[in-house]
């Protein structure tokens, strides 16, 4: 099974997991459409992977997201949502607006993508959401993100029933060595990498390419829906 002749939309496709998924999907014959906030970064990503098109907008802007899908000229087979990310802040240091934004970038974004993409998606196509294992591994700096990611498995299962025959699956990732991780950790990045190499059962850090391989697998296997797939190198067991 491959993606020959299919259209894959990457919501958050200019770097990291989204970009790697675009590269892998294009290699399997898909037409890829990249979205992100920065037109400059999208242009570089498009040249890298040979994207069919790019569109710059903020995916958390519901109206812009809806217009994006409405303006697509052709049907879509698969959508991967990687926009959004963790916020390393204790809950008591966050304002109510900070908390709303963090929750929105996880649960609400996935729902709005599903709502906007549904009219353009082919039956049997798939929506792949990104979450994490934080709901099972509590960190005092990730309380809100942990709460949001813990809600995503039942959210995904219910959405799969509502969207059927469009399939919906969730990738629950641990630490992934992405540009976003580098930006969030700053000077602590190398120490974090070294720690994971020493402690993870796989003996190395999970890469964007690892997650991209899983994302494409969820797209091409038509029997998979409503499920959550962990990819953390065994991090949750240590």
Segments predicted by a language model, with ranges:
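C-terminal substrate-recognition "lid" of short-chain dehydrogenase/reductases
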Residues: 204-231, 236
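A glycine/serine/threonine-rich, flexible loop-to-helix segment
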Residues: 176-199
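Substrate-binding pocket helix/loop in short-chain dehydrogenase/reductase
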Residues: 90-91, 98-103, 192, 196
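Rossmann-fold cofactor-recognition segment
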Residues: 48-63
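Catalytic loop of short-chain dehydrogenase/reductase
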Residues: 102-103, 111, 126-164, 175-176
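Conserved glycine-rich cofactor-binding loop
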Residues: 14-15
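Conserved Rossmann-fold SDR core element
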Residues: 153, 162-177, 224-231
């Amino acid at each position: 099974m491959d993606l020959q002749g299919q259209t894959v939309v990457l919501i958050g496709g200019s770097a990291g997991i989204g970009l790697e998924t675009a590269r892998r999907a294009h290699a399997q014959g898909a037409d890829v459409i990249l979205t992100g906030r920065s037109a400059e970064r999208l242009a570089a990503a498009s040249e890298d992977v040979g994207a069919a098109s790019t569109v710059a907008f903020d995916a958390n802007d519901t109206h812009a997201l809806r217009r994006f899908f409405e303006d697509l000229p052709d049907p879509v087979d698969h959508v991967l949502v990687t926009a959004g990310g963790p916020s390393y802040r204790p809950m008591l240091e966050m304002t109510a607006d900070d908390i709303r934004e963090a929750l929105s970038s996880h649960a609400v974004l996935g729902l709005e993508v599903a709502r906007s993409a549904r009219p353009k998606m082919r039956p049997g196509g798939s929506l792949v959401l990104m979450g994490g294992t934080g709901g099972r591994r509590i960190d005092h700096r990730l309380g809100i993100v942990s709460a949001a990611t813990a809600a995503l498995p039942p959210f995904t299962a219910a959405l799969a029933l509502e969207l059927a025959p469009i399939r919906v699956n969730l990738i629950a990732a641990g630490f992934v060595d992405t540009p976003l991780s580098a930006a969030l950790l700053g000077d602590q990045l190398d120490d974090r990498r070294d720690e994971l190499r020493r402690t993870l059962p796989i003996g190395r850090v999970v890469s964007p390419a690892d997650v991209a391989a899983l994302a494409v697998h969820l797209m091409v296997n038509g029997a998979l829906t409503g499920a959550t797939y962990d990819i953390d190198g065994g991090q949750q067991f240590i």
